[in-house]
Amino acid sequence: MTNFTKEQDQAINDAGKDILVSASAGSGKTTVLVERVLKKILSGTPVSSLLIITFTKAAAREMKERIKQKISDQLEIEPDNQFLRSQLLDVDTANISTIDSFCLDVIRRFYYVIDLDPQFSVLTDETQAELLKERALREIEADYLEGDNQDFQDFYDNFSGDRDAEGARNLLLQLYNTATTEPNYEKFLDNLPTCYEVGDNLIRSNLWQQQIKPLLLKEISDLKAEVEALLAEPEINSSDLVKVKENYDIFSNRLDSFWESLNTDQPYNEIRANLMNCKFEKAVRKSKKWSDESIEVYQDSQDLKLDLNDQLKKIFASFFVVEEKEQIAVLQKSEKIVKTIVAAEKKLIQKFSQLKREQNLIDYSDMEQFAFSILTTDTSNAHIAQEYYQEKFNEILIDEYQDVNALQENIIKAIKKKGQNTLFMVGDVKQSIYGFRQARPDLFLSKYHTYGKDNDSEKIILADNFRSTKRVTKTVNDLFNPILTTNFGGIDYKKEGQLQFGASYYPSDLPTASEYIFTDKKQTQSAYEDQYGDEMDFSEVQMVIARIKQLKAENFQVWDRRTQLKRPLEYSDIAIITRTRSDNLQVMQEFAKADLPLFVTDAQNYFQTFELIMIMNYLRLIDNPQQDIPLVAVMRSPLFNFKEPELAQIRVKTPAGNFYTALTSFASVNSSLGKKCKEFLQQLETLRSFAATHRISELIWSIYEKTHLLEIVTGLPNGQQRRVNLESLYERATSYESAGFKGLYQFISFIERMRKNQKDLAQPLLSDKADNAVKLMTIHASKGLEFPIVFVMGLGHQYQTRDLSGNFTISQNELGLTIKEKNYRIDSLVKSLADVQKRQQMLEEEARILYVGLTRAQQKLILVASVNEIENKRKKWVSELDQKKDIIPLVKKINAQSPLDFLGPKLEQKHEFDQTIRDMTSALEEQDKLYYLKFNLDLEPEKIKDQNEDSQEVNSNVNKVVKELYNFKYPFEDATKTTAYQSVSEIKKAFNDPIDTELENSRLISSSNRYLQPIDETPTFLEGQKFTGAEIGTAMHLVLQYYNYEGNKDQENLDQEIDQLVELGKLNSLMVPHLSKEALNWFVMSDFAKEFWKQPDKLHRESQFSSLVNASELFNDFSDPSAKVLVHGTVDGYFEAKDGLILFDYKTDFVDKTNEEQAIEKIKQKYTGQLRLYEQALNEMNNDKKVIGKYLILLDARKVVPVD
């Protein structure tokens, strides 16, 4: 018989109250749920009178099986109990299901309440649902545009570019997903504009009083506390630091004034002025005569100063960029656009519903909306439905309660017995990781903080962890004590969230020490770019592989709970879990090279697979053969097997024009290659003709048949999965056309959107090898699972914050929808506030995701990361933990860039038995010190001796592993040091060009110009802002790029052009004083530019190009003479003269006037290679005219220099 803890016993037996069970990881919540159901049945409650809601269908199946097993076990004791026998039969038909399945049951039973045809079908294919939604969107677009609706046009213009309307469409589709999880989506939508209503006084508005003011007071209070902590240091009063203290006293008073003006509701512009006055006096320089203690405190004061200035800049940028009048204007304009969005969204929902009704379909969002309508619509029929379920269910048990959304919460409320406490909710807010499904952890937290304070509710905390060893439990607690707090995550982890060790069945001599393995990314030479926003380091995978091999070689022992014995480690005991699956393909490749078995439980990233890239390129080619990259990719693929030398022959014969032109020309050559080209073009033309008269799905299948593609990929490694992937694309094309869509280009665009949204189509292929293989999965997929050894990988990945800087933010709080009005180029106060809130919500969920990952380990936890400049990061982490409180300050947490920013501060602190915690790099030779390894984070005293005895052998093993890894010579090493694609900005670095115009230009503008109107007053903490030479050079290029040669030929014209660039948001107003207007005016008035004035239509600026270049021409010592690199770049300018093209490039390099001739020659040598590259590109782009002259425009020297 199971011995339950006191808290578990309460959760099983307590009744008469609404009960919330907060069940930490590994606390046996499923066992408790099953036992509670059994107790209900044994007390005479039929299982049919219970509603048990689970999060997944698999969980529902498991729940049913476990309940049936419990009843069967009881029947062994009471074989004559007929009631139990009837209950055993009833379990399969009992209401144990997901919320969607329950809602579907409501609809099938009471469809007539909402006038729904009972013969409806469920739209289970997500892709088909997306297609139908897309069709609804296109139809409302057409209705609006045909009606010449200017408000709608303004909305689309605000969020979309010149070429498409994807920005506005994405907004409407995302808003749909949020609105339809609300119990009253129309009310939710109608409330969206209200947060913009501020009248003529910001300070008196609800927005300011209820949202912005409390946030700012809290932030400034935190800054004040940091200042006060420094001023409380005894050493700050020393004679060495008198001026430092004076500086901080003055700053502290200014910060107090800002806080006081906020707190007392002074006018907005006065609050803004007080913020702008928050500055430090002149910097104090450090003296060598100071004591060591003074120097240490001085350095702390400098670090704090930088941090304070940084935080104040962010506050200014978010809430005080312009004065009150301008802020109100932005809010009013935004409000108008939001009202238009609301109207369009309602039409989209109505149109989508209409299309589904016409086909008698309902989708998953309909299930919950329809069920809620049936249960709450104010008609006699609705009351019948609601009363039916209220009478039917004596108790409602909800698993994973932390992941319910607002609509689901209201459905549950609607069926709860009136006036009775019949809710039993189990969950763990620390494991709420489904924000992308509109999960609402705040619903759990609301009950968590109120239940138990009256006689109608009860809160039970299950903290005992029966999964993990004491060391794993201690590691998790140590790491999360500083992270999860009441103001970050909503729970005080130290007081109420810690795991309590409960797995006393583990033997005491098991090897269980937690480990973390860091690689210094800066020193690694092979890296993959992943879709999560960072690089996935080769060495990170290699070190995981090395550690697995080491564990196997050491005959590492695991505890088998089934046999209650120790046994040697098997591969199936190991799980590698990651934040995303984007690196799966690379991990699989490395494991295959290492001959280690690996089973990927998640679907691969479908759109990254070789076969999908190949077929999509062929479809692009059929749609438009005048595309070089798809054309060459298809020709080089296994379908046609054109080799590099053959492609080179084709290009040499026709060096001008695109590659399709060259291919067509070569097809007439009487040779084996010419015949090959001709056959390729014939098949392409056949398929293009076929595409014009047949369905897309038929075209895809025709490609498979003509090229034998299915047979080809089946013969490759993992061939069956590749075949499934291709067949899946065919099925999606069929679904696409069934939904009423047509056109190959549109289908390609649709698939591209799915790729960008990472909506994988393929399903994982089950494998016989899964039984004894290392498991690779995402943290989301690992939830609810456990493994003896867990590697948590990719902890150095940068968080993806792109959505936070977008044109809109959607949330389910009071702000709802917040947008950026593009004509102002500043974020409205509402948008700035929403971004702050959204960032914290996102990072809170990332912290919870991390918690889920770390708590999967039973016996051993290994954390793995590749980190840039690891030593600098370690210094930063040391300063980010408040050691007295064991807390990472909130401001540090909401600025976290990666999981390591959460974990690092605690990992870097001294531990109780620090003498056993060593950098294992100390055992390595200097050349091998790529890896920073720390083991045994939580060693207990009795294990110190054993660990010291083993350390020499472990260090020797690590040394050997690292040497083997880095003595390996990759046969294509040269190719790993570059890519098949290079931008000119990268190549210019090889030519030592100090100005990366093509790349830096857009980055400079986007980061510095957040609004069109110039700020009249510069905040004092921004005064004296310095611009680099590259930034100034970029701005000079920008002026010349847009200069109008059709205007007046004078200095005033130049000033007007610069002012217009500032007004348009293309040039930072703070940059203008740094421009050399004399140099700019010299050039536009020079003899060289005189033809520009005469024929401005012949002048081409910022011309983009792509060119295939020999790699050996770009990179020294490149061993493969046949290797090619596709170069993409932008030419500053060229002029179409009568006899040919005049190519020119601006340079802002400093020219030494004392030795001008030699300095110019040096600059000329530096950039000759670059201009030759531009010359080659222009010659390939132009059939009629070739480059007849190349010139460097040296703005500093006021010289036009010809280049050979």
From Swiss-Prot:
Protein EC: 3.1.-.-, 5.6.2.4
Give start and end of each UvrD-like helicase C-terminal domain: 497-784
Q: Enumerate the Gene Ontology biological process terms.
A: double-strand break repair via homologous recombination
The residues that hold ATP are A23, S24, A25, G26, S27, G28, K29, T30
Q: Which segments constitute the UvrD-like helicase ATP-binding domain?
A: 2-469
Give the signal peptide, or none.
Answer: none
User: Would you tell me the Gene Ontology cellular component terms?
Assistant: cytosol; DNA helicase complex
User: What highest taxon heads this organism's lineage?
Assistant: Bacteria
Catalytic activity as recorded in UniProt: Couples ATP hydrolysis with the unwinding of duplex DNA by translocating in the 3'-5' direction; ATP + H2O = ADP + phosphate + H(+)
Which Pfam family name is an example for this entry?
UvrD-helicase
Q: GO molecular function, one example?
A: 3'-5' DNA helicase activity
Keywords associated with the record: ATP-binding, DNA damage, DNA repair, DNA-binding, Exonuclease, Helicase, Hydrolase, Isomerase, Nuclease, Nucleotide-binding
The coenzyme or cofactor needed here is: Mg(2+)
- How is this protein organized at the quaternary level? Heterodimer of AddA and AddB/RexB.
Entry function: The heterodimer acts as both an ATP-dependent DNA helicase and an ATP-dependent, dual-direction single-stranded exonuclease. Recognizes the chi site generating a DNA molecule suitable for the initiation of homologous recombination. The AddA nuclease domain is required for chi fragment generation; this subunit has the helicase and 3' -> 5' nuclease activities.
Q: NCBIfam families from the entry?
A: addA_Gpos
Name the family the entry cites: Belongs to the helicase family. AddA subfamily.
Protein's UniProt name? ATP-dependent helicase/nuclease subunit A
Q: Which organism is it from?
A: Lactobacillus gasseri (strain ATCC 33323 / DSM 20243 / BCRC 14619 / CIP 102991 / JCM 1131 / KCTC 3163 / NCIMB 11718 / NCTC 13722 / AM63)
